[in-house]
């Protein structure tokens, strides 16, 4: 406990939200410099809370949370809960101790737990399977409000198998209805009660949700294998039917997930039955597949050859897997270009709004707030990072023209915020230098930088892709057309390894 608790406190995010008591991680940070005699009482308190050996009122205080409504898309709302720092600290410490056990429990096809670059890894897995089995039809399933409707008992029971101590600790808070304080105004609030669902903002939330979704994902995987075996005339192998990995059939089936973002792949002749099976399996687990927001796509299967239920959700240009475009690399990258165009357009609107925040007194949050400093922080740490995710996963040649537009937007917004009209070449360079080197911290997405981001991401996710698909990602130009194509089959890695 001591080692993981110390690590949890040492790596706690500075400036994160306070609990209802007003406590923050910074108030506990001096314990990192405390002697063993001063640290021991804190460690004993943490151990008592972890084991449930504390008065009921302590558990009730730690179960409370402050709710915040975040914007989700154009009209949706994402509820976020901020718990007491002590609970968050202890939760992270317990997860450090069992994260490998949880990852082994949910398996390599759940990319949200224990996998660095989980979304890119899942997208690359889909891309590689699509090129290996070109007749596969891929479904991207949308589960309606999945996080907030997940059965708590199912999730805790599944977690119990992998991490009983963590499950026992979390049951103190998820075993009874949760209450959250939500402010309606400066002097007004309401209490929100939740009986099901995983709390977004809980450090254990992703692991707990992934455990809750494990059973339906496993059931769906088994059902699809059985479907293909029976269709191809194979007898079901009862001993191996529940194992992870590819199906032992002429064509592979796959079920991948990043939390509730679920990808299903089957040979085209089983597409309709697979879609119906997915709807049925998730319904038994309390989840609803939204047909209108789901999609399907294939490299070689034509839309006209699929049944009406699949034609209605057909995506001609590819799928967005975790927001990452997956498409036919031999055709025009329409999906990737549209996504990058959307990113640049949204960033331009947000940058314009930041400039308005500085110049329009009616938009001021408070008379005393430092508008220039605040908007520069948002520009540098939020907007300027929005291209990196896609630069790591899309062919640099596709990204480059959009990166030029993106950098121009960032630079123009910065100059308007600090009220500077023109800069020379030397000053332009200084804008892109890191703060620690005397620059302004506006990252420049040059061709070399885009290539570096792309290659480093591919190398990072390669082990996860191999674990999920059995396919290798080799950074060598000899395999550029084979199974190391990453997200652009004709892309050569050899010159980039020297960067």
State what each model feature region is.
Residues 1-216, 226, 452:
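Conserved pre-catalytic core of RNA-dependent polymerases
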Residues 418, 422-499:
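Extended C-terminal regions of large enzymes
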